[in-house]
């Protein structure tokens, strides 16, 4: 038997398709999302509707974004969901969530079992729309969730941790084994809740500067910041900010990265591209 076939659909590797089929896990996720009528619920990658059906049962309207043409067509003719759905057959990476929020007249509640092959770039895409998003609930590779929630002085802490925590409060919800999917992925999964900050705890003047600093620091994470960020900051400047130049990228807090970004914005701003 081909374990890539589920409900008559052949899972496509190029779309990173693994279909959720564990009822306990599905119920736990829907309970964590707690969808309510009248909310602007948006699902990314509904697939074979494992989450779409129980969420849709509680709603009058649901927006879904599905890249796979066959799956989008199945949803359109779904016996009870079809009339409730607004279906965008496109890549979520090309979706303007700000425009979608404006259309729906309120901040979005976004959820989904994200394809693991695009989960990190998709997270960065969504971060750029956090002013249009109320919250997000995603199934991700467990290793990615560990990175999202990691704090300084840990191996999992990296650029994704800093940028996610800059924009959102990040809360792990539950772990999910490979056996909950068809076909089973080779890795463990986990569900995470991301709630955009109502007030930024460490606002930066130019997000591009924070992005640049974290990229340069974590691309050379074994080096001290005296070396990895030496082209941006002198030892004296770091010391004045109360940041030890002998620290590595993984030792620096989100607040300190934001402090460095604001110093650079004031003293050596990026040119407009």
UniProtKB/Swiss-Prot annotation:
Its main location: cytoplasm. Its EC number is 2.1.1.182. GO terms for molecular function: 16S rRNA (adenine(1518)-N(6)/adenine(1519)-N(6))-dimethyltransferase activity; RNA binding. Gene3D superfamilies: Ribosomal RNA adenine dimethylase-like, domain 2, Vaccinia Virus protein VP39. InterPro entries: KsgA/Erm, rRNA_Ade_diMease-like_C, rRNA_Ade_Mease_Trfase_CS, rRNA_Ade_methylase_Trfase_N, rRNA_adenine_dimethylase, SAM-dependent_MTases_sf. It is found in: Cytoplasm. Specifically dimethylates two adjacent adenosines (A1518 and A1519) in the loop of a conserved hairpin near the 3'-end of 16S rRNA in the 30S particle. May play a critical role in biogenesis of 30S subunits. This is Ribosomal RNA small subunit methyltransferase A. It comes from Salmonella arizonae (strain ATCC BAA-731 / CDC346-86 / RSK2980).
């Amino acid at each position: 038997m081909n374990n890539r076939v589920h409900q008559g659909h052949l899972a496509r590797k190029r779309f990173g398709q693994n279909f959720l089929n564990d009822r306990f896990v599905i119920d736990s996720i829907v309970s964590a999302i707690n969808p309510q009528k009248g909310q602007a619920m948006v699902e990314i990658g509904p697939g074979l509707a494992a989450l779409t059906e129980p969420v849709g049962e509680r709603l009058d309207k649901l927006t879904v974004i599905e890249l796979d043409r066959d799956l989008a067509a199945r949803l359109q003719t779904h016996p009870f969901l079809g009339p409730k759905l607004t279906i965008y057959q496109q890549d979520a990476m090309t979706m303007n969530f700000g425009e979608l929020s404006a259309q729906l007249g309120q901040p979005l509640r976004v959820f989904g079992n994200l394809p693991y092959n695009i989960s990190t770039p998709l997270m960065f895409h969504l971060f750029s729309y956090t002013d249009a998003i109320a919250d997000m609930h995603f199934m991700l590779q467990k290793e990615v969730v560990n990175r999202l929630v990691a704090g300084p002085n840990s191996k999992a802490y990296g650029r994704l941790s800093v940028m996610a925590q800059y924009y959102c409060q990040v809360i792990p919800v539950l772990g999910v084994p490979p056996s909950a999917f068809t076909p089973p992925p080779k890795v463990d999964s986990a569900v995470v809740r991301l709630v955009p900050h109502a007030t930024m705890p460490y606002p930066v003047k130019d997000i591009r500067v924070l992005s640049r600093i974290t990229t340069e620091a974590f691309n050379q994470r074994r080096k001290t910041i005296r070396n990895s960020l030496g082209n941006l900051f002198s030892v004296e400047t770091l010391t004045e900010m109360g940041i030890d130049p002998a620290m590595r990228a993984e030792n620096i807090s989100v607040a300190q990265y934001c402090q460095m970004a604001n110093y650079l914005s004031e003293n050596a701003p990026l040119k407009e591209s």
